[in-house]
């Protein structure tokens, strides 16, 4: 009983000391939003102002018959949730 308690304490101390700050922190979840792009600069500015993220314009190929809505340039904004 005494040895198992000592072993448990040593394992706990090892786990705490092996982590950077003693606290395990998970990564932030990534989210995104998109809207019709009005230019790269406006896209970046709006994304930063509204979401504190990184925005970029995506210029798709000409529309297909299946997805004509994809013709418009789209501002894609990626940010931490």
From Swiss-Prot:
How far does the signal peptide extend, from start to end residue?
Answer: 1-19
Give the primary localization class.
Answer: secreted
Task: State whether keyword Lipoprotein applies.
Answer: no
Spans through the membrane = none
Tell me the disulfide pairings in this chain: 31-81, 37-57, 43-75, 47-77
Q: Which UniProt keywords apply?
A: Antimicrobial, Disulfide bond, Fungicide, Plant defense, Secreted, Signal
Q: Which InterPro entries does the UniProt entry name for this protein? A: DEFL
Q: Which domain of life is it from?
A: Eukaryota
Against Pfam families, the record matches this protein to: AtDEF-like
**One GO CC term on file:** extracellular region
Q: Where in the cell is it found?
A: Secreted
Q: Does the keyword Zinc-finger apply?
A: no
Q: Name one GO biological process term.
A: killing of cells of another organism
The Swiss-Prot or TrEMBL record describes its family as follows: Belongs to the DEFL family.
Protein name listed in UniProt: Putative defensin-like protein 188
Species assigned in the record: Arabidopsis thaliana (Mouse-ear cress)
């Amino acid at each position: 009983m005494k040895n198992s308690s000592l072993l448990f304490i040593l394992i706990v101390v090892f786990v705490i000391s092996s982590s950077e700050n003693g606290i395990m922190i998970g990564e932030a979840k990534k989210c995104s939003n998109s809207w019709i792009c009005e230019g790269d600069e406006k896209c970046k500015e709006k994304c930063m102002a509204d979401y504190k993220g990184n925005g970029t314009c995506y210029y798709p190929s000409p529309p297909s018959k299946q997805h004509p809505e994809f013709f418009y340039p789209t501002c894609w904004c990626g940010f931490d949730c």
